[in-house]
Structure formats: C-alpha cells, structure tokens
Regions:
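Mature N-terminal, pre-catalytic/accessory segment of carbohydrate-active enzymes
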Residues: 25-53, 57-65, 77
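Catalytic domains of carbohydrate-active enzymes, especially glycoside hydrolases
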Residues: 66-87
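Structured C-terminal cap/extension of enzyme domains
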Residues: 497-547
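Alpha-amylase-like alpha-glycosidases and glucanotransferases acting on alpha-linked glucans and related
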Residues: 35-43, 48-50, 93-234, 259-489, ...
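Conserved, well-ordered alpha-helix/loop/beta-strand core segments that scaffold catalytic motifs
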Residues: 226-258
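Short, acidic/polar
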Residues: 62-72, 314-323
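Tryptophan (W) side chains
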Residues: 12-15
Length: 547
C-alpha cells in the first residue's frame, strides 16, 4: 500500500509539472530494474582467488581443506563473494582461459585427501609425494603425481559398487550431454602424445563415425576413467559451493568469450567456428595494442561464425552459460565488448597488429540467451568485463541490458582530469563491480613501485589528501569499500600487501604465469590481528558486511 501511494504521488507530481506519462513510466521502470538488480547484486564485497592459489601439500591448490578454510576466512571477515577464474581443464601453459573444454571441470583441482576419505587412496601413498614449493605451482610435477594418484583411485573405485552406481547415474543425466565426447577427446589426445586434434589421423580430425567407434572401443578404459574424474571433480566442487553458500558467500565464476582451438568444443562443433577445411583457424581473436601490451594481444582462439550460431538460436551458447550457472552463482563474461565488436586477426599474423574490428551479434544474442535461460533480460546474473579503449557502443549495449560493468582502481589515476576517468571513485555508479586490480594486473604494490608514473603517484596522493602513501594497497581497498558500486572485489595478494612476485598473470607473456600460491599463515583460523580483521572493519564501516 505504501509503495502504491508513493507511485500515486510520483504520478501526480509529474502531471503537475506537465511531464509526459511516458517519462513517468520510464522512471517507474528504472526503479523496478534497480530493485531487481539489487536482489542479484546487494551491496557486498569479496576476494578474488583461484583455487590453484590455495595452500596445500600437493603442488597445486585444490578443493580440499584449505578451500574450506578460505571460505571460513571470508565469512569471518564479513565477505559475501568469492571470485574464481574459469574452472575448465587447462592445457599447455595452464591458462584457465585456454581450457580443453568449456563444460568439463579441471581435475587437477581434485582433493586427493578427499579420495582418502572415500577409501580409494591411503594417507601412506600420498605421503610418498615429491617435494613441492609452497609458494609457486609446480604444474608439471604436480600434474604427474596427481595423474598417478587419480588412476590408482580409479582402480579401487571400480570395485566400489555403490560409488560406481552413483557415478553412472551422474554421467547419464541429460546435463552431461557433453561428457562422452569430452572423455573421447581426452583419451585420443593422450594417445597422440598431447598433440592438438588437428594433428590426429584424418578420420579422427573429421570425426568419421567408423573411426570414432573404433576409438571408443580401443580407449574404453581411459574414457571411463575420464568420466570418473569429472564426476569426482563436480562432486567435490558442489560440496564446496554448498558450504560457501551456507556461509552466505556466493561464487562468481568466469566465462571467456572465446574457447581454445585445441578443445573438445571446437573438435565436436567445427561448424560453429571460422576454420579452414582442415580445421585450422582462418582468423583468430585478440585485441589491438593497449595498456597491457604494446603489440596488442594475439590470443590464438578461433573466431565464431556468428551467423551459424544465430541460425541455431545460439543453442551452444545457451548450453554453455546454463552449465556455468549450475556451478557458480554469478558469472563474469570476459571481453564483453566482443558481443558488440570483435577484433579479427588474420591467422598468419605473428602479432595482433593488422587486425580489424567486425560487428558481433549485439543484443540479439542476449535476447536469445534470456529466453533460453528462462530469465528476464534485465535479471541475468552476469558481470560485463568492459575494459579497454573506445567502448562507446559496448557500454551502450551493457547499459541496455542493465548489466554491471567493471572499474579498476589501478587505472584511476592516469589523468589529472577526474571527469575523464571513469575509474575514479567519485565517477563510480551503483551498478558496477570495483576491483583494485584483476588477475591481469600487477599487484597494487607491484604497480605502485614498478609501473605507476610520477603523475599517477602524485594524483593518488592528492586524491587521498596525503603527502606520503605508506600503504597503497589499503588506500585502494578503502576507496573500493567506500565506492557507491554495489560490489567491491580485492585480489588476496592486495589484501596481503604482496609485491610484483605475487602477480598471477602478465598478458602477452606465455610462460611462467598462473603460478602464485598463498601460504597457510595467510588463511588463519583466528583472523584477529591479521589483514583479514582489517578488511572486516572496512567492510562493516562501509555497509558491505553480510549477516
């Protein structure tokens, strides 16, 4: 009744001012959208940390006890968001953004201790592991050890009739329509020594029915083991997510707009991608020169044939987003601008220079996605990664969908003209997600000491009213917490005050990335006297604490 009376007063005031009724309706609709968005994005804060960066004794962070400890730290500090990078199986270079499948999970994240609890491994077997650095992921050695342990666990699993029945039931579910092709893809890739699918036999490249049938028979045991590994991954992930949700913490996942060429997705669906007769890309994805790279970024991903996607009603994309939203609560779409315009680089070019911008599917894609997911267009649980230059049309597309964009505080001080820099806190808007930096940025301390210009440092000092900046990471955290944006995310490295050696990724540098790990002491049982307590105080002070 109160809301109805308020609406009547609003209508009368507009009428008295002779504003057209359409203006009244627009105002009311905007208010409804704000209310609907608030239910998806309440005022909140959280931490960015990929599971590989967790502590643990097996060379790579995983979904075991330390992941639960991290959730406990988030809850104790009043946080309500855990943001992760893509969770798919990684290939060469271990980049989460170059997964072997957009539907499968990264089985390197399986908790081996969890398999001890299942009775498929022993503590004594895990105790015979090699030495692993606690500070950096040793992917080659860790994956070799994990592969051995997972195969050993599988050999025991097949004698556990109750578990076998549960696994088979999971595999038969209609949502696992992708699983058999993925398991075959992995078995063939292993058989061919890890070579890309375009280098397999011609009959396998072209997916001839007889060849695939023979391969399924020849590699039946390995295919079954890959099905088992996927079941274990999703069983462990679902349990971890349920625990996080029970603590009031939502998980933000990540969808790269493009998929890796050497992936089950492209092998199974070549008609959806811009490939030549032999399955190799005609053009590849990337971006022109920008802040991150003087020669641009040449990602190597094949481009979509958007006309074919449109012809199918964007069915593959709808399946992709639906599958992601079954394992996370909110999803960030990386390189959102690609739905408006995408950068097309001839495959033979060695760098991203010489490409051109081409129209993407625009709002038609999102209308189809909305219908396919059964959600209103302005209620999609999506964060638009809208970074880059010359984004006018992409920003308009984002705003028409009422999606939150992003602001990076490290980028806020590159100009003294505050009104020209949308990343400065006083230019933030409520429907936005603010970060000190992302996985592609240096840490705040690394930026402050190694990358920021004298002008940027002076601008930050003037902005906060200090002659000297002793803790640039906490200055930016304070800004993010105080922002009018509904969500603020801080990478764990910035909360811990770590330098450039803790950087997760440097775009354009293919080797040595994605390796940083936090230490056990960084995730204390009692947050008193730690950076977590300081984060908690700021969270409460700025109205972001949950519970």
């Amino acid at each position: 009744m109160l809301a109805y009376a308020a609406d009547l007063r609003l209508r009368w005031q507009r009428w008295a001012c002779r504003e057209p009724l359409s203006g009244v309706l627009d105002t009311m609709r905007k208010a409804e959208v704000v209310s609907e968005q608030a239910s998806i994005f309440p005022r909140a804060s959280g931490v960015l940390l990929h599971p590989t960066s967790l502590p643990g004794p097996y060379g790579i962070g995983d979904l075991g006890a330390w992941a639960y400890r991290f959730v406990d730290c988030l809850a104790a500090a009043g946080q309500s968001v855990w943001q992760v990078l893509p969770l798919g199986p990684t290939g060469f270079g271990e980049s989460p953004y170059q997964a072997l499948s957009t539907f499968a999970g990264n089985t390197n994240l399986i908790s081996l201790d969890g398999l001890v609890a299942d009775g498929w491994l022993s503590a004594e077997e895990l105790a015979e592991r090699p030495y692993f650095s606690p500070r950096k992921c040793d992917y080659a050695a860790a994956i070799a050890f994990r592969d051995e342990m997972l195969s050993l666990a599988y050999d025991r699993f097949v004698r556990d009739s109750e578990a076998v029945a549960a696994c088979e039931a999971w595999c038969r579910h209609p949502d696992r329509w992708w699983l058999d092709d993925f398991a075959l893809f992995m078995a063939l890739k292993e058989y061919h020594g890890g070579r890309p699918w375009v280098d397999w036999t011609e009959s396998e490249v072209f997916r001839e029915k007889q060849a695939l049938g023979a391969a399924r028979n020849m590699h039946a045991t390995r295919i079954a083991e890959h099905r088992f590994r996927q079941w274990v991954f999703f069983r462990q992930w679902d349990a971890l997510r349920a625990y996080a949700n029970s603590k009031g913490i939502r998980i933000v996942g990540d969808i790269p707009i493009y998929v890796a060429h050497d992936s089950a997705d492209v092998w199974v669906n070549p008609e959806l991608f811009d490939l030549d007769f032999y399955g190799r890309p005609n053009f590849i994805a990337g971006v022109p020169p920008d802040y991150f790279s003087a020669t641009g970024q040449r990602w190597g991903n094949p481009l979509y044939l958007w006309e074919e996607h449109q012809r199918t009603g964007y069915a593959w994309w709808i399946q992709r987003v639906r599958a992601t939203l079954q394992v996370v609560d909110i999803v960030r779409i990386d390189h959102f601008r690609g739905f408006d315009l995408y950068y097309k680089i001839p495959a033979e070019r060695p760098t991203a220079q010489g490409g051109r911008w081409v129209n993407g599917p625009k709002i038609g894609f999102f209308r189809a996605l909305s219908a396919g997911l059964g959600r209103e267009l302005d209620q999609l649980p999506i964060i638009a990664e809208d970074l880059g230059d010359d984004l006018g049309a992409a920003i308009a597309l984002r705003d028409s969908l009422h999606l939150p964009g992003m602001a990076i505080l490290q980028f806020a001080f590159s100009s003294y003209e505050g009104e020209e820099n949308r990343f400065l806190p006083h230019n933030h808007v409520p429907n936005m997600v603010v970060y000190t930096g992302t996985h592609d940025n240096n840490t705040v301390w690394g930026w402050w000491t190694n990358e920021s210009s004298p002008g940027e440092r002076e601008h930050l000092r003037r902005y906060v009213g200090k002659d000297r900046i002793d803790e640039p990471n906490w200055e930016l955290i304070q800004m993010g917490m105080a922002s009018p944006a509904h969500t603020f995310i801080v990478p764990l490295q910035d909360m811990l005050g770590l330098g450039a050696s803790a950087r997760m990724n440097k775009p354009g540098v293919p080797a040595g990335q994605w390796r940083w790990r936090c230490l056990p002491d960084d995730l204390p049982q009692n947050i008193s006297g730690t950076p977590w307590e300081r984060l908690a105080a700021l969270t409460r002070a700025h109205g972001r604490a949950q519970g």
